[in-house]
Amino acid sequence: MGREILVDARGLEPPEPFEKVMDAVSDMGPGDMVLMLLEREPHPLYRVLDRNGYEHHTTFRDDGVLEIRIRLKHA
């Protein structure tokens, strides 16, 4: 079981959420997962993740926060 890396990007203005999550995913190892918290859906981020070998799953919480779980595709 790997690490869970939390990126709380709530309240941050672009491009800071993107920069923070890209720093976190670049530090991931096999089995690690990044959990990103955000108030808006980051469509540009999804495209970058897809192109670079990551899978992502987004859950919409009742409080308006999105939980985005990011893993390496081969992990």
Model segments located where?
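Positively charged, polar, low-complexity stretches
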Residues: 2-7, 11-15, 19, 23, ...
